[in-house]
């Protein structure tokens, strides 16, 4: 959820999305969802001569699984806050994993196996 929250803070900013098929699209971030699907408006394709069919497109929806990179303006990225939140999320994940492991161990110790000969 870290990146989802981070991208939500960038709504309204201009970003460049590079797709796995080498298409790069620049536009204003309109919305992003938990799957990191992205909606851009007022888009511009970086290599219009290579993708002439994209010239007339003004808005687009990009499925998160086809994104290779997202280029962000440096002034909009607060590295310290991002590092703090990633550490916090890692700690919470570690805590959840430990609790899950303890529950699994308790369940396995409570079950007994009987064999008949």
From Swiss-Prot:
For this UniProt entry, what is the primary localization, expressed as one broad class?
nucleus
SMART domains found in the cross-reference section: Sm
Please give the Gene3D superfamilies that the UniProt record associates with this protein.
2.30.30.100
Superkingdom of the source species: Eukaryota
GO annotation, biological process: mRNA splicing, via spliceosome
Query: Which residues lie in coiled coils?
Result: none
Composition bias of kind Basic and acidic residues appears in: 83-101
Please state where this protein is localized. Answer: Nucleus
Per its record, what are the GO molecular function terms? Answer: RNA binding
Instruction: Provide a GO CC annotation, any one.
Output: nucleolus
Where in this protein does the record put region Disordered? 83-117
- Per the database record, which ranges form the Sm domain? 2-76
Does the keyword section mention Protein biosynthesis? Answer: no
Q: Which CDD domains match?
A: LSm2 (cd01725)
Leader sequence segment: none
Q: Name one Pfam family in it.
A: LSM
Bias category Low complexity: which stretches?
Answer: 102-117
* Protein task: Plays a role in pre-mRNA splicing as component of the U4/U6-U5 tri-snRNP complex that is involved in spliceosome assembly, and as component of the precatalytic spliceosome (spliceosome B complex). The heptameric LSM2-8 complex binds specifically to the 3'-terminal U-tract of U6 snRNA.
Question: What PANTHER family does the record point to?
Answer: SNRNP CORE PROTEIN FAMILY MEMBER, U6 SNRNA-ASSOCIATED SM-LIKE PROTEIN LSM2
Recorded family membership? Belongs to the snRNP Sm proteins family.
Record text on subunit structure and interactions: Component of the precatalytic spliceosome (spliceosome B complex). Component of the U4/U6-U5 tri-snRNP complex, a building block of the precatalytic spliceosome (spliceosome B complex). LSM2, LSM3, LSM4, LSM5, LSM6, LSM7 and LSM8 form a heptameric, ring-shaped subcomplex (the LSM2-8 complex) that is part of the U4/U6-U5 tri-snRNP complex and the precatalytic spliceosome.
- Name-wise, this protein is Probable U6 snRNA-associated Sm-like protein LSm2
Which species?
Dictyostelium discoideum
